[in-house]
Amino acid sequence: MRWCLLLIWAQGLRQAPLASGMMTGTIETTGNISAEKGGSIILQCHLSSTTAQVTQVNWEQQDQLLAICNADLGWHISPSFKDRVAPGPGLGLTLQSLTVNDTGEYFCIYHTYPDGTYTGRIFLEVLESSVAEHGARFQIPLLGAMAATLVVICTAVIVVVALTRKKKALRIHSVEGDLRRKSAGQEEWSPSAPSPPGSCVQAEAAPAGLCGEQRGEDCAELHDYFNVLSYRSLGNCSFFTETG
């Protein structure tokens, strides 16, 4: 009963400005808006340029009444939209769980005194969920790109580790080769160990003996040489004696 009285009273207010012709205010709206399927949207209108008192605001979708906000009785939501329509903020209206069928024109009708009725228009377009579409469309390529990136990173890490180990192994082999060469060179050029005193005497004794034998022969030759000289000198002396 109260619902019917509000509608009748609203119709009476709507006819009032036609007789008075004293409408000076304007309705400011968000104009054309869009929202994603499954989301929510706020329909908002604002009355300006007038000092008239707002007595009631009706929200309608084309020919369907969605909600009424009365200055004295408060909000009343149409039973067919209770699950998806919420009052506010302010004199606005919130649509929830949007579907493609919610696309269309919405009207905010301000009933004022003494100006009468002001009407604002909002066009809502409900779009398919871009998040779901883009997620489904780009999920596989994104996962593929991530997998490829991980493969590249893992390959790079493996290559770096392998090169590092190879360099370390080469350094170790190089150091070992240098050590072996140094040890071999030291063994070749190191002085031989001193022989025992007995062996040294025996080694040096043989040349001495040989030298003694060679000196004996030389001495014998010198002795013979001096004998010849003595013989000759004696011969000369005897020769001088006989001549004298």
From Swiss-Prot:
Protein name as catalogued: T-cell immunoreceptor with Ig and ITIM domains
Would the keyword Cell membrane turn up in this protein's UniProt record?
yes
Q: Does the keyword Manganese apply?
A: no
Where does the record locate the signal sequence feature?
Answer: 1-21
SMART domains referenced in this protein's UniProt entry, alphabetically? IG (SM00409)
Q: In which tissues is it expressed?
A: Expressed at low levels on peripheral memory and regulatory CD4+ T-cells and NK cells and is up-regulated following activation of these cells (at protein level).
Q: Which PROSITE patterns match?
A: IG_LIKE
Q: How does it sit in the membrane?
A: Single-pass type I membrane protein
Gene giving rise to this polypeptide: TIGIT
Effect of mutating Y231A: No loss of phosphorylation
Domain of life, per UniProt, equals: Eukaryota
Tell me the residues on which Phosphotyrosine occurs.
Answer: Y225
Ranges where the record places region Homodimerization: 32-42
What keywords appear on the UniProt entry?
Cell membrane, Disulfide bond, Glycoprotein, Immunoglobulin domain, Membrane, Phosphoprotein, Signal, Transmembrane, Transmembrane helix
Quaternary structure annotation from Swiss-Prot or TrEMBL: Homodimer in cis; binds with high affinity to PVR, forming a heterotetrameric assembly of two TIGIT and two PVR molecules. Binds with lower affinity to NECTIN2 and NECTIN3. Interacts with GRB2. Interacts with NECTIN4.
Recorded GO CC terms: cell surface; plasma membrane
Where does this polypeptide localize? Cell membrane
Q: Which cysteines are joined by disulfide bonds?
A: C45-C108
Q: Which Pfam families match?
A: V-set
Q: Give TM regions.
A: 142-162
Q: Where is the Ig-like V-type domain?
A: 22-124
Spans within the Extracellular topological domain: 22-141
